[in-house]
Amino acid sequence: FYGQWKKTGFGEKGWAKVISNGKMGDGPWGNVFAGKAKGGDAVSSLKPASDEIKLAKGFEAELLYTVPKKEQGSWVSICVDDKGRLITSDQGGRGLYRIDVSQEEAKVEKLQVDITSAQGLLHAFGSLWVNVNGKGAGVYRFTDTNGDGSYDKKESIKGLNGGGEHGPHALVLGPDGKHIYVVGGNMTKLPQMDRSRPPTNWGEDHLLKRLPDARGHARTIRAPGGWIARFDKDGKNWETIAMGFRNTYDMAFNIDGELFAYDSDMEWDAGTPWYRPTRFYHVTSGADFGWRTGTGKWPQWYP
């Protein structure tokens, strides 16, 4: 019946019975209109990982390490290096950490690099690639030139203009093993590219006047909004793959090499006609997923 309710003379005959999934405010989301979400029961103490995670048959979850927030911050990105160790980054100014989980007890060391606030980490092509969000935003490459376990060479690959929760985000190795994919939120200005798959003549024209966000969020941000691009193993030949995202944080390829991403809309717009619920995107080449500021975003039924 999708779309038929707009037609003259439409009747409700044939509609299925309404199914209730719970009252507004039930977990896990909480009441989004109450000012403070309280969905579900608060976790008063740390539980084993298996008690917190739903696992498929045959899988197990193990708690490896509990991050002391006061000393090591809030870890917001993670990757695996060429020796199977984890590398993570604090969201703020507490730096990068390397975690060896090969023994019964995890060994954690702070990396001696002058960088922090990485929301994208990837070890590929013999180097650590870092996407910094905030001061000094941009993509960097760190290399251990003498094999002593320390990253002694730092290179700025491309500076980015953006930061905060909608700034530069994930780095992912492409399925061809030759390219690195990078994503930027809608407050990350699209940098100079060598080529673009989406047409670059995007516009902001509307038949009806747009209503900007009443609280001022992203009022001055215009197309292309959030974007996904890629570059080669030397950090060159940047190419825009898709655009029109709001704040996609991460992405992944399936076994067939198809790219998928996850996005969300402004949470305080929930219940309005222009709200677009959280969703997965099948990121096809050259796509524009239609985020525009305020009420100017493209409706879900646009092709």
Task: Give the role of each language-model region.
Residues G39-P303:
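Beta-propeller domains with acidic blade repeats across secreted/periplasmic ectodomains
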Residues F1-G39:
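Accessory carbohydrate-binding/adhesion or oligomerization-edge regions at the termini
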